[in-house]
């Protein structure tokens, strides 16, 4: 191959690489993430993730109000402040979802739902909203925790029913709080909850990096 042929070959290769990079740029639109915490436990996860400084939209949906929330975390009051633990097994039912909540999902964002199964608000909302998002072909992920063993058999039965409803979604993932408690059994209970919040984030991060074609995510989602 003479010098002229070599230059033509290099020019063609450079053009091909440019076109491939251009196609990758066009096809890999930046992912707009909307983190949504459902119920008290889910809202705690949102506060934990917010501290990481990730460029995203944040919303907490729970009761009671959280006046300490930073201004860029939206809050929607939903549910009752009183939970009757004796009737958890009877609480698998559809809740009335307000227009304010439904309007959150009108955008083309990637929605990430966090909750702790066991509470009436978070458990039922997660189940209902996941079904709604799936039906509307929205991109979403649901991450929820299963309760500690000491929280009682009725609460455990309630959450198992909800988990069965979520098992049909491939993008729903659960974390067992009892496993985390055993791992950090020498720590105080609040430490186990903090570790659970981080486990929820890491589970989201691992799955979104596998799913998304946005190459910038690996830099924008801290470890």
Residue ranges, per PLM feature:
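N-terminal secretory signal peptides and thylakoid transit peptides that target proteins
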Residues: 1-14
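Tubulin/FtsZ superfamily GTPase core signature
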Residues: 10-13, 19-223
């Amino acid at each position: 191959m003479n010098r002229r042929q070599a230059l033509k070959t290099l020019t063609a290769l450079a053009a091909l690489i440019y076109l491939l990079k251009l196609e990758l740029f066009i096809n890999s639109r930046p992912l707009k993430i909307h983190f949504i915490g459902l119920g008290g436990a889910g809202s705690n996860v949102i506060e934990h993730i917010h501290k990481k400084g990730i460029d995203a939209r944040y919303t907490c949906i729970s009761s009671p109000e959280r006046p300490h929330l930073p201004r860029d975390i939206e809050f929607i009051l939903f549910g009752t402040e009183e939970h009757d633990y004796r009737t958890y097994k009877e609480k698998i039912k559809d809740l009335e979802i307000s227009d304010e909540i439904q309007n959150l999902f009108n955008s083309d964002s990637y929605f990430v739902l966090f909750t702790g199964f066991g509470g009436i608000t978070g458990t039922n909302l997660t189940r209902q909203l996941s079904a709604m998002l799936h039906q509307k072909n929205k991109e979403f992920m649901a991450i929820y925790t299963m309760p500690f063993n000491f929280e009682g058999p009725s609460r455990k039965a309630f959450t198992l029913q909800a988990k069965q409803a979520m098992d049909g979604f491939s993008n729903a993932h659960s974390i067992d709080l009892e496993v985390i408690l055993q791992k950090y059994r020498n720590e105080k209970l609040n430490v186990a909850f903090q570790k659970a919040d981080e486990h929820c984030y890491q589970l989201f991060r691992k799955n979104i990096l596998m799913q998304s074609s946005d190459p910038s995510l690996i830099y924008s989602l801290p470890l």
